[in-house]
């Protein structure tokens, strides 16, 4: 057995973490020969619930789980970690504006960024799920200068999975036959699911689904509003699907990308090939090489419709950045 991989998870008593922790501990992500150490973070008043989750995980007797520790101090949770999965964040309450939510969560991600900076491995990879995840990720990044800026990601993999499902459903094929699905921009209602560059059975989407009106309206809006639809139907936000997408996002980053494919993740826009303003956490199509290096896929074409939508999501991210500019170290 190799040395254990240390993974920190914030929001450990929440529903996403509950759907995630057992799968991580089982070895699903890193395989049957890799030990795992889980370091789970929660706010003090949720530690009792988290203790119950810890007991359940212990009762599974996972052979690959080297240890599980729980705490309310990010400086303990993030010590010497290889990965941080930042799930915990304040949710939007009644009457709360997006600006209010950003301000509330900025405090959390300033603190967590500083803790990562102080005690995490400099090579640690950070995945932000807590919303608004793009700008929360930017805040954490700007408070962790000792970590590599290119190793901070906000999750748009759930949006990619949703888009993949809707395209497969419409074309009546398996989801495995849908590829090269890109989510551009923000993980919000302005996100842009790209049907122009996606493929179904290795063919351009529009040759299989020649209904431009459905693609421009029904498809895009269904992806953009899927989270809200789940809340309306279930009374709670996405949890198991978000956990599954987070595992997908980590797998995307860890393993080489198959030839001719790519995945979506939001990362720092500096030096991107599409003219998106720098200093944003923006979702792009990406690939990982055999040596583990991640790069943005270049050369994808935007038609006028796609370009207009992408400019809107870029503008929203610029506005979010401005809302928290007073606490960003830029």
Curated annotation (Swiss-Prot):
Residues that coordinate or bind NAD(+): 11-17, 105, 112, 129-131
Reactions it catalyzes: (S)-malate + NAD(+) = oxaloacetate + NADH + H(+)
Enzyme Commission identifier(s): 1.1.1.37
GO molecular function annotations of the record: L-malate dehydrogenase (NAD+) activity
Protein's GO biological process: malate metabolic process; tricarboxylic acid cycle
Pfam family, one: Ldh_1_C
Alphabetic keyword roster: NAD, Oxidoreductase, Tricarboxylic acid cycle
Active site (UniProt): 187
Binding site for substrate: 92, 98, 131, 162
Family annotation (CDD domains): MDH_chloroplast-like (cd01338)
UniProt similarity note: Belongs to the LDH/MDH superfamily. MDH type 2 family.
Function statement: Catalyzes the reversible oxidation of malate to oxaloacetate.
HAMAP family from the UniProt entry: Malate_dehydrog_2 (MF_01517)
The protein's name in its UniProt record: Malate dehydrogenase
Organism of derivation: Protochlamydia amoebophila (strain UWE25)
């Amino acid at each position: 057995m190799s040395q254990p991989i240390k993974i920190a998870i914030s929001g450990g008593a929440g529903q996403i973490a509950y759907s995630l922790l057992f799968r991580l501990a089982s070895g699903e992500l890193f395989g049957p020969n890799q030990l795992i150490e889980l370091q789970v973070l929660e706010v003090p008043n949720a530690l009792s619930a988290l203790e119950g989750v810890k007991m359940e995980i212990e009762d599974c007797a996972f052979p690959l789980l080297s240890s599980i520790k729980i705490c309310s101090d990010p400086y303990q949770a993030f010590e010497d970690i290889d990965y941080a999965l930042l799930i915990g964040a304040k949710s939007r309450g009644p009457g709360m504006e997006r600006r209010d939510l950003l301000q509330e969560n900025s405090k959390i991600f300033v603190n967590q960024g500083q803790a990562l900076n102080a005690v995490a491995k400099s090579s640690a990879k950070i995945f932000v799920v807590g919303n608004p995840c793009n700008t929360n990720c930017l805040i954490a990044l700007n408070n962790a200068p000792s970590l590599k800026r290119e190793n901070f990601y906000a999750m748009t993999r759930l949006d990619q999975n949703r888009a993949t499902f809707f395209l497969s459903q419409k074309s009546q094929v398996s989801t495995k036959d849908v590829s090269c699905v890109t989510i551009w921009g923000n993980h919000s209602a302005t996100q842009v699911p790209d049907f122009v560059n996606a493929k179904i059975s290795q063919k351009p989407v529009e040759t299989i689904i020649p209904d431009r009106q459905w693609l421009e309206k029904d498809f895009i809006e269904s992806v953009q509003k899927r989270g809200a639809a789940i809340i309306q139907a279930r009374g709670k936000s996405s949890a198991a699907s978000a956990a599954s997408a987070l595992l997908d996002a980590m797998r995307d980053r860890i393993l080489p990308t198959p030839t001719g494919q790519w995945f979506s993740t939001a990362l720092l826009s500096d030096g991107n090939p599409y003219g998106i303003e720098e200093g944003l956490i923006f979702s792009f199509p990406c690939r990982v090489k055999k040596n583990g290096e991640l790069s943005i896929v270049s050369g994808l074409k935007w038609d006028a419709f796609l370009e207009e939508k992408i400019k809107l999501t870029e503008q929203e991210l610029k506005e979010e950045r401005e809302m928290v500019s007073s606490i960003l170290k830029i």
